[in-house]
């Protein structure tokens, strides 16, 4: 019995130790900057940095149906809520690269003035750069998983990352590696299916 308990304890210890290994090696200079920035933030600002709003809230459509950033509305949102990140394209439509540059520049200018920290933009680019006009589209991840081809998964993800970064957006909500074990889940097509091994391999 003692041997079993000892074995379990050692396994738990090994698991805990491996869980604390960072994926990317930390940079002491960057860590120091982060700590300095955190010390300057109020509790309200820290809470705001953990919030995310959709792009639609920062503007409206003009008479031609083209979205624009409303600087008064944006200033009001950022000064009141200190938002840390913004999600997806306005009206769930795909802006051009120039439109993205303009939207982001306008919001960042106000964010830097109000909080001193740039907002992070994220897009649901789960199967290609779907939120940019002229972007490359790929099959949904459930279809990619059906190929059992890791190379296809990797190369389509690389292309998506490249095209997303090309429009000044550093973050995509992909890959979705939660297991699809309930067909009622509304994101079922965005993952790699119900098999944990397949999902882990395709999501590497």
Language-model-derived ranges and their functions:
Residues 1-23:
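Bacterial Sec-dependent N-terminal signal peptides
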